[in-house]
Amino acid sequence: MRFMTTAQPVRFATLSLLAWTCLLSGCATPAATEAMIPETASADKTHPYSVNVEVTGGRATDPTGTPQIANDAFDEAITKTLIKTETFAKVKRDKAGNYELSVIIFNVQQPPYGGSASVTMETGWTLTNQLTGEIVWQQALRSTYTASSDSDVSFSGRLTKAMEGVGQNDNKEGVTEFVRCYL
């Protein structure tokens, strides 16, 4: 006959706690492009030129780490917003545009854990005339978004929603600001 030792219930409780922690924290998923495109973005005017977009400073998401905004995803979100708002006559995928919009993600602050997930992102937006090399507009932006505790069961899910929300806010503010410049 085999008897249960006192170590077995402790081991079971520890493994159960670990399993619940993994279930509730979830795996990190990157911010989705479509979720970073603002629904209500609009341009006050349309520029008759072409533009290409380049994003740097983003990071790929490690599934065991925290959600991030990748360069390609944010680049695509900004590009789709420019197309949707008809801010420029044409948005090019290569460096052949009349203007280049460079966006640098230079600071992202995320909470380590918690109920609500508030994310702050700082970016630098620069619009450059490709022919002359002249910087025609430059702006530093700081955006914040909070995903409430009821927006997703897992903290990782809330953090992904917060990353998407902050990306959307920054995208909308950036496009709204630079469309006002005189070209």
Predicted regions and their residues:
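Bacterial N-terminal signal peptides that target proteins for export
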Residues: 2-16
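Bacterial N-terminal signal peptides
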Residues: 13-25
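A structural "domain/chain start" motif
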Residues: 25-80, 85, 179-183
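C-terminal/domain-edge helix-coil "capping" segments
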Residues: 27-45, 131, 136-183
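A short, structured loop/turn motif at beta-sheet edges
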Residues: 43-47, 91-100, 127-138
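A short, hydrophobic beta-strand-centered structural micro-motif
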Residues: 50-54, 86-112
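Extracytoplasmic/secreted envelope proteins and their assembly/folding machinery
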Residues: 71, 75, 79, 85, ...
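A short beta-strand signature
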Residues: 119-129
